[in-house]
Each structure stands twice: as C-alpha cells, then as structure tokens.
Amino acid sequence: MLRFVDLIQNPRRFLALTGYTVDEFRALLSFFIVRFQAYVAIFTLAGKPRRNRTYSTYKNSSLPTMEDKLLFILHYLKTSPLQESHAQVFGMPQSQASQWIHLLLPLVKASLADCGELPARKREDSTLAEDEAGLFFHDGTERPINRPQDPEEQHLYYSGKQKEFTVKNNVVIDEPCKIRFLSETVEGKKNDKRLADESGYRVPQGSV
C-alpha cells in the first residue's frame, strides 16, 4: 500500500511516481490543503451539500492525511493507471478510488493555478511572448486511450502509426523545465506542426 510517510524516504522513487520533488510537493500541498478544506466545509466527499456534521478523517481511511490525498491524485496523473490498478496500490475498492479521483482532480488543478504552475491552454492566456528570448522546447505528446464506442470516433482517434487509439497535446517547456503552454487535446495522428499552427502560441522573438 502506497503511503506518503514511506515514499518520502526514497526521494528518487518519490519523483518517479509523482513527477514532483519532495520540496515541490510540499509547496503545492499548502495550496491543496486550502482548496480541500474550502470544499469539505460546503460539500460531502460525495459532492452533496454538507448539513450539520463537519468533515473529519476516520482512522481507517485509505487516505488518512492530506499528504496521502495529494500523493494519490498526483500518482494517478503521473502514471495514468486503470482505476482498478490505482485502487489496489492505495488499498481501496475501485468505487472509492473513482470517487476520490473525481473529487481531487479539480482541487489539484485549482491548487496549481493558485500557485502559478498551471500552463496556459489558450493563446490569449499565454504570456510566452512577453518573456525574454531564451531556450524553449516544443513537442507533441501522444498517449493511448480506450477504444471509442462510436464508429466515427474510432476512425478519428485510430493512429495507423501507433496501431492503437490515441490522443495528443503539444507542450512548450522553458529552460528550467516548466510547462508554459499545453494545447487542446486532439486526435493522436494530427501532425505536431499543424497542431502548433492551430494553437497559435508564440515564443519570444529571438528565442531558440
């Protein structure tokens, strides 16, 4: 069973399973706690309006600490496992894992926005062009998805190159390895340059 208190003893494994160093994790945690506490003050974990009883964590909870909750959702985002597999790693039934995923995903996204680490998704939101000229890395990231049920979507998302159904995003990363722009999600077979042209983002003049 994966737990923060155990994983923190191995910083390299911690980075591999979350995409964050321990220091980066702790920095994000402070914003995550604020978002989580604000949510459970109003709603139950099932998303229903909270009445009289305040939120408390049970001793036998599968995610007993705020660190474990953040670890749970970051590990899910980093490794993209099946919910059944993710549930097994954290010692809970799949239905409970699904509930936690749907609860924590928007909270961690909001936390990243709060600390200024959420990449721009639209050209008009990007501040790339305002930066000083520098080194930027541009790449397309293609990943598999489950076979769509709709025949038209099957045709759209099937990649002959990969021999599977895929989606793609373009990312722009600066020299310190911070993701500065993340394009919309499209079919994996779309050409990287075409997606870049459609996204319309611009790096500072004189950049490499």
Tell where the protein language model's regions lie, with residue ranges.
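Short secondary-structure transition/capping motifs
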Residues: L17, S61-S62, H75, F90-P93
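Structural motif
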Residues: K59-E67, S159
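Short, amphipathic alpha-helical "recognition" segments used to contact nucleic acids or chromatin
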Residues: T65-T79
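Short, well-ordered secondary-structure "scaffold" segments embedded in the functional core
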Residues: S80-V208
